[in-house]
Curated annotation (Swiss-Prot):
Name of the encoding gene: irx1
The family this protein is said to belong to: Belongs to the TALE/IRO homeobox family.
GO molecular function terms noted in the UniProt entry: DNA-binding transcription factor activity, RNA polymerase II-specific; transcription cis-regulatory region binding
Nucleus as UniProt keyword: yes
Record-given protein name: Iroquois-class homeodomain protein irx-1
GO biological process: brain development; cell fate specification; dorsal/ventral pattern formation; maintenance of kidney identity; mesoderm development; midbrain-hindbrain boundary development; negative regulation of BMP signaling pathway; negative regulation of DNA-templated transcription
Amino acid sequence: MSFPQLGYPQYLSAGQAAVYGGERPGVLAAAAAAAAAAAAAGSGRPTGADLGSSSTAAVTSVLGMYASPYSAPNYSAFLPYTTDLTLFSQMGSQYELKDNPGVHPATFAAHTTPGYYPYGQFQYGDPGRPKNATRESTSTLKAWLNEHRKNPYPTKGEKIMLAIITKMTLTQVSTWFANARRRLKKENKVTWGARSKEDDNIFGSDTEGDHEKNEDDEEIDLESIDIDKIDDNDGEQSNEEEDEKLEHLRQGEKESFKKESEVMIPSSDGLKSKDSLSLGKESSDTSNTRIVSPGGQGNIQVPPHNKPKIWSLAETATSPDGALKSSPPPSQANHTSPPIQHPAFLPSHGLYTCQIGKFHNWTNGAFLTQSSLINMRSLLGVNPHHVAHHNHHHLQAHQQAPLLATNLSSLSSDKTPERTSPKHSDRENLPRTESPPQLKPSFQAVRENTLSQQEGTSRILTALPSA
């Protein structure tokens, strides 16, 4: 076998030499010499020439594959490099400079400008490319502005038209008109009304309202506007605004001070203690309620039970319960008000808690004694005997209050001899506004409680057999 396409000839026989004789003439000669040598060997008489020729043929046949290894082999099964095929005829050279069309096909148009690859939308030579505002481009804008001096606000459609004519962007056109309007205001002091909203709504302008609201927010043309004057105007406006704010603050402080003074000043309640002044914020001047004792000898002022105001919620939450229930010293002025029972004496219908030491009195209801019946409040309200006991206690307290006042006055007259002078005697004849103190000794309260308990026990003992 031989592979002449790859250039590797092998040992050939006589039959094979005929096959490849037309392709390889050198191989054919070597094959003929080898055949002659074989015939001579078969005859049995080899000669020296035959031996030399046979050895030469063997060496030639062996070295035939190395005879011309680099002699331009013709690979008919593959594409040749020397001849240009019609498939790649339109392709240029692969190793040319980039200034040439390169490997691009001839049908594709290469860049006309060598070495320029645009990143933007337009090229340098494109007439649609936007450019800076010049005198030629702004002449159209000036002409439109002269025609519309009364209303120098172009609509969205007019801006688009002017931008196409002047080859500018919409932002450039809007900025130019804003600066032009500012120049007109400063030079000619021209004032014009607000632009019509109908034209703006037709084209759906979304940025034009900003120019209408405030012209000072637009861009400023530094070449045509005096910056110092603008700064002075801004300073004057800021000073005026600060003065107005100060005036508003002062007026608000005066109004708040008046309201506080109206709340703090009492109408005709006489002398008040600090507790009553603190409670005065919660009450109005005309809604003071008083409680008349059963004896009718004195008036007890009670803090009103109206709706608390907002600023007093913190005080009511933090103040103890005793401060709200304590009543200030009453005055001797007679106020005709209907008798109102104190809320502590009113019957309540809630469940009450008991002390831990008296818990057995609540649980062991079958073993209640007479004293526990007196001191125990029912689960549905106040015991009627308890109400009578409280009324009797307050009646005796008010009857003994003038006696205590006279005793105190006699003691004070003994200690101060100046009170007997005529100057002080005149003052003593005047009606006093001071009220007798409501402080009661503790032993009186204990004695009264024992008396009232004995009366209550007698009433309960008389009521039990009847039941």
